[in-house]
């Protein structure tokens, strides 16, 4: 006979047995604590979570009473000069990085006196083939073909404005065989034909690492060759388009200098991505090793919610520190401040003076010892 054993033995104290096997509760982790501080399920249902997760700059755009670092506040663009520059830009069908990149200094640069008002013209259209996580310029794999009249129109606009110094920048055009290098060179040549006295700075791309294209632009007649590193080496893969590398950008600046040693070479760094002091120092050393003359520091400001969040709003005092540090390392000129941008005009007067002295072979130009703070903060 088969004996049948009950499935459950009622004599066993089930509850007590389960209780004795319960492990002690784990300590809360840092992640859990931070998660509990954030929005709850009810916040998401009510719609409050969205506001709880926005950074101060985003909130300030919606709520005038929200806290925003005072050094990041700028005046509303207005004035006769501002509207005149805007009119010329529209009439000649030009693009400007001032508008496309939502530059905070547009009211100062466009709204200055006639001798000071300027716009940084963006060549090769208003659409980039790359998609860096900090940039608000439109992107597309196949932008419209470059306007063949753009070099002539650009030269005409610059002649109208009566400038002594002009900055040209460009979108990346990986869809073009030469990356747009010859178009940029032609624009510089047209400007020099119409107004030989004008000093020209070009903020160019990396041409996919084709250094022959760098040489074409360097030999076009420009006076300042600028190419931006944007950030430190460790953060580059997370911030810039994957086709742009830190070492490739250094190679561009180095080749430009070797091609024409009289050129002033220039680059810019944005702070606020979470970079460390050690990483910034390493970047400055790398730049000095390749003979880069000018560096600028500015605060990264998130253009839209689709872009990288700001990790830190760097104080004006910290920007002063990096200005002094870079000057001590031997840079010819340094512009450093929350609202400074790569094409910001704060340094142009000094660079213009340096270049004019070089044109007239007036010995060695001494390095600038003191740089005035930009008036925008």
Curated annotation (Swiss-Prot):
Q: Which cofactor does it need?
A: [4Fe-4S] cluster
Signal peptide span per the entry? none
Q: Where in the cell is it found?
A: Mitochondrion
Main localization (coarse): mitochondrion
Q: Does the keyword Nucleus apply?
A: no
Name one cellular component (GO) term. Answer: mitochondrion
- EC numbers for this chain: 2.8.1.8
Q: Where does [4Fe-4S] cluster 2 bind?
A: 128, 132, 135
List ligand-binding residues for [4Fe-4S] cluster 1.
98, 103, 109, 343
- Recite the UniProt keywords alphabetically: 4Fe-4S, Iron, Iron-sulfur, Metal-binding, Mitochondrion, S-adenosyl-L-methionine, Transferase
Residue intervals of the Radical SAM core domain: 113-332
Q: Which domain of life is it from?
A: Eukaryota
Pathway given for this chain reads: Protein modification; protein lipoylation via endogenous pathway; protein N(6)-(lipoyl)lysine from octanoyl-[acyl-carrier-protein]: step 2/2
Q: How is the cofactor bound, as the UniProt entry phrases it?
A: Binds 2 [4Fe-4S] clusters per subunit. One cluster is coordinated with 3 cysteines and an exchangeable S-adenosyl-L-methionine.
Query: What GO molecular-function term can you cite, just one?
Result: metal ion binding
Please list the reactions this protein catalyses.
Answer: [[Fe-S] cluster scaffold protein carrying a second [4Fe-4S](2+) cluster] + N(6)-octanoyl-L-lysyl-[protein] + 2 oxidized [2Fe-2S]-[ferredoxin] + 2 S-adenosyl-L-methionine + 4 H(+) = [[Fe-S] cluster scaffold protein] + N(6)-[(R)-dihydrolipoyl]-L-lysyl-[protein] + 4 Fe(3+) + 2 hydrogen sulfide + 2 5'-deoxyadenosine + 2 L-methionine + 2 reduced [2Fe-2S]-[ferredoxin]
Q: What class of enzyme is it?
A: transferase
Similarity-based family: Belongs to the radical SAM superfamily. Lipoyl synthase family.
Q: What else is known?
A: This protein may be expected to contain an N-terminal transit peptide but none has been predicted.
Which protein are we looking at? Lipoyl synthase, mitochondrial
Give the taxonomic lineage as stored in the record: Eukaryota, Fungi, Dikarya, Ascomycota, Saccharomycotina
